[in-house]
């Protein structure tokens, strides 16, 4: 019934198994990949005919985690998986980025890759396995995919590189780097690092590339057994159109791409395109070529013009040389009510970045396959359509916004103070108000300034820069601080963020084969120079965190109480803690280990809440004097609330000096009194006294009398 094939190898000390032919047999390609006890299913389906009216590759990649994979039931009312989580979105992008450049030019068939996590062993992150499985499924599918690719995670622990570190090991690593590529070249890198050098980062990339070669060999072996016949792809020769187009608009395009202002340049390019279309599609005549083909050739010619100019003259679209960074204006404290804010402008790219400090109540609960955990640092990136002079629909965060936000998050997180030293929940929002390339790196720069403006003690300021590459045969040019056009028309998008001490985040997407280690080394060195320059410009606005938190930010005081007192502080059904919050106006968060965090923008509120909590969580001391309130008057004395929720009895004989006939002659309910704790009776009841305390001054009369009585004897002894 089943025509099964499988390949198994040892990879990083664990077995990797790739199987096909049993599950999802109606898909064009389907592979079940197992690593340890983590299992994923990758499927590929490609439409039988091209999609009409498109000039791009209609590829969709969806990665999904099923909670049953970890033996759990989803939370929420409906108890089933809902919209994609951030992790699912990020892994979908992680798979998409290295496979997209490997489809044959001209492939316009709808293609969908779906990767489903079926089992998770809590040791091996499914993301790398998902990339491997997707590569294998594409290789088997018959689609014109020039793979396979391999992928690996690289850690750096105790100054040694570690292949595919487990989830436990990744906690201690200085580097979390994912690299993917073919047998010959690296195509994609995504990483977070603790201020590591360019040399360590580059060696990590090459380490990963070497160590995923056995995976590529295994996929090829499986394909030799089970791959489908390659789909036929008609390659259309556009040489005639190219010649005609070049003679018609080359000089006009060169002139248009010499205009430095983006909107003016786009307008000029638009007029050149209109000229070309009018030539190829004259009114009243039957067109000689398909409109999409002509538009595609025009787009390719745009890329060639930009690339030729850079390689031939060393001059870029806006007149810069390959190493120059655009003009920078950095400002901090631009919003009056925000806890921290910054406006970072680099050429025609601008980010308004705002920091908000919150308390434990503001932590984000993340429900992942590995379990639920709390995130105390959030960074959100928004890219509204007006930032590029367009109209569009506003809605939830798109995949690109989630990916760019995570990249900036990775760049900033390594320089944040430990949570036990700075116990705030931190939310940073980057609003891209203008964009012409490298908006994610502008977000990193703005986030660093905004956090320091809020008083967050960063280890060091952090900056980011986007690098590009033009490669033609043996000639190449590495570009610093690329424009949007240089990103679209170039061969590489290489984003590097970090401090003066080292790299904190690196992301690389390469569109062609042939990027050598030497080219990457040049790009990293040039990126370091650019990063140091940008940090210098940022320091003109702010070079370190402000000494005080923002005026409107909450203050947090942290202390500990005995764990056996937590229940008393919270009270039945949270009654006590709610009363403390309502009456003091402070926010209170109590953790399982007895750590208490009290937060408010008002210092008096914090003091009142702390005093109240400590009075509940600690015991009164015998011989100490306390201020209290009479809560009940009885014939035999008065009950006084004197220590948080604790009450004690002032016996009628302890109300005042001399004989007291009636308790109500001395005190009334609600009266404020001063009492001394005498001790506890046989039943543990509290005994208090008013008569030994001066009700005006709170002075201990017994101690005063004793001191006065001892004074003459001491004098006589002398």
UniProtKB/Swiss-Prot annotation:
UniProt keyword Transport present: no
Catalytic activity, as annotated: RNA(n+1) + phosphate = RNA(n) + a ribonucleoside 5'-diphosphate
Entry's Gene Ontology BP terms: mRNA catabolic process; RNA processing
Binding site for Mg(2+): 487, 493
Cofactor(s) the protein needs: Mg(2+)
Function noted in UniProt: Involved in mRNA degradation. Catalyzes the phosphorolysis of single-stranded polyribonucleotides processively in the 3'- to 5'-direction.
Basic and acidic residues: compositionally biased ranges: 701-718
Top-level taxon of the source organism: Bacteria
InterPro entries, alphabetized: ExoRNase_PH_dom1, ExoRNase_PH_dom2, ExoRNase_PH_dom2_sf, KH_dom, KH_dom_type_1, KH_dom_type_1_sf, NA-bd_OB-fold, PNPase
CDD domains, per database record: KH-I_PNPase, RNase_PH_PNPase_1, RNase_PH_PNPase_2, S1_PNPase
Protein name (database record): Polyribonucleotide nucleotidyltransferase
PROSITE patterns to which the protein is assigned, alphabetical: KH_TYPE_1, S1
Subcellular compartments: Cytoplasm
Annotated KH domain residues: 554-613
Gene Ontology molecular function, alphabetical: 3'-5'-RNA exonuclease activity; magnesium ion binding; polyribonucleotide nucleotidyltransferase activity; RNA binding
Span list, region Disordered: 692-718
EC number: 2.7.7.8
Classification lineage: Bacteria, Pseudomonadati, Pseudomonadota, Alphaproteobacteria, Hyphomicrobiales
A single cellular component GO annotation: cytosol
Enzyme superclass (EC): transferase
Pfam families on file: KH_1, PNPase, RNase_PH, RNase_PH_C, S1
